[in-house]
Amino acid sequence: MKEYLINCTVQREFHLLAFSISADLQLVLFIGILVMYLLTVLGNLIITGLIYLTPQLHTPMYYFLCNLSVQDIIYVSSVLPKFLSILVTGDARITFPACITQMFFFAFCAVSEFTLLSSMAYDRYVAICIPLHYITIMNKSLCIILFSISWFVGFLNSLSYAVLVSTLSFCNSQDISNFYCDLKTMIALSSDDITYIKMLVYVESIFLGLTPFVLILVSYTCIIATVIKIRSSAGRVKAFSSCSSHLTVVILFYGTSLSSYMVPESQYSPEQDKFLSLLYTAVVPMLNPLVYTLRNKQVLRAMDNILKRYLKF
């Protein structure tokens, strides 16, 4: 009995159970994940650099985009390097402190991104519905406040999760049925009574996920109502095009992340959860820079100018 209690309290290692696939498929998956990781980091660094080097992009919209890029870099870097290491070495072990750290940074960026996307929707609302007051409303002070709220909410939420999980006991199993330390999986693994914890996390996920989503819906409802009143078709197209990139990112991010966290326990499938996790930890962050560059003439123009300026022979 004494040895059992020691194992419960001193256990400081877990095993990440990634995809059960053949060695050949593991190599293919490794190459795919590595390419997506490099594209995500490189793409977001390019966007951040473009915004910094181009005075014409020093506007609230692009400041928000710069914050989003930084969050995406931290987001993927908290999960994918360890996953790549598992695919190469086959060593799926992760220490308890490393697991808590990974979960902290992942939750930090995920929640911050939810909040930031709602701020970006408000920015688009002001730009389209109240254009004459845009500069007055979206001033530097408000932008800093919105950035700070985004990062603070994410930090506070992830810190509470990290503290919560660090107090749990893990006596039954040390096998995490995912390729990273996911909050939902970690809680389910605990040998403690987790009924109230699961309810707390579920309610908090709804609040932190759906509240920004409702704010985004309200913003876009007002935007659509305003755009419909524009008489010229060219004006309507221009207004909608200024929102298309943000709307695409919202659909991708919310569609994949909430579909994983809002699934009832009766319909839960570990393999399906891993697949959805792969989508919102690797695929969606890779698409974000592409969406904001390929669909944005200002960014493409800035990129062209930078290339001409620095690649002159």
Segments from the language model and where they lie:
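Transmembrane helical core of 7TM receptor-like proteins
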Residues: 1-313
